[in-house]
UniProtKB/Swiss-Prot annotation:
One of its GO terms (biological process) is cytochrome complex assembly. Residues 21-227 form the ABC transporter domain. This is Cytochrome c biogenesis ATP-binding export protein CcmA. ATP binds at G54, P55, N56, G57, A58, G59, K60, T61. The lineage of its organism: Bacteria, Pseudomonadati, Pseudomonadota, Gammaproteobacteria, Alteromonadales.
Amino acid sequence: MNIIHQVNEAKVTSNKPLPALLSASLLTCIREERILFDRLSFDINPGDIVQIEGPNGAGKTSLIRILAGLSRPYSGHVSYCGETILACREEFNADLLYLGHLPGVKSELSAAENVDFNLTLSGYQDFDTQAALAHMSLAGFEDALAGHLSAGQHRKTALARLLHTQCKIWILDEPFTAIDKKGVEQLERLFLAHVDNGGCVILTTHQDMSLIKAEQLRTLTLDYRSL
């Protein structure tokens, strides 16, 4: 998707394209003397849903950690709105929501306390925790200790923050793990609403999606070869 920014001032129009929301430039990743991907380049624009796929060990998690700035590539760089993420770390982090394959839920806190903790840690003040949990089908579990919740409820507790975040870039590692079909559809609707508002979603998953159609989804396949 090419986003064109037009400035009308004194009857002058500029058709200069905006930089991509997130760009990978010639990324190479080597783990344990094995090349996972080599010279990988792509742009992710507002409105994009990108699924990273490939066999186990192909480098999916390594790639999304590099995109999130949590790992360094062997070579190449990642840019946010035209600047390398190393040069604009604060701005990039403020616009990024990353959820790893582990839900990151604290077992000694309740479901509501976990949502409050994560959103407050991200700088948010005005949010409706109960509404977020209800949207994730966790109404009635607000006060339940996370340590007593199922794996699917853990994942939903972690994902509840998506309801209130203002970050444009969502990077999610296996967000559908342990979630039933209804829960997957709830998340798909959330993804579609997010990209309709100018955000982007980057995810890994082994599950099929029923609401996000093929024409709405970009796929990036890692297969151990130079890309």
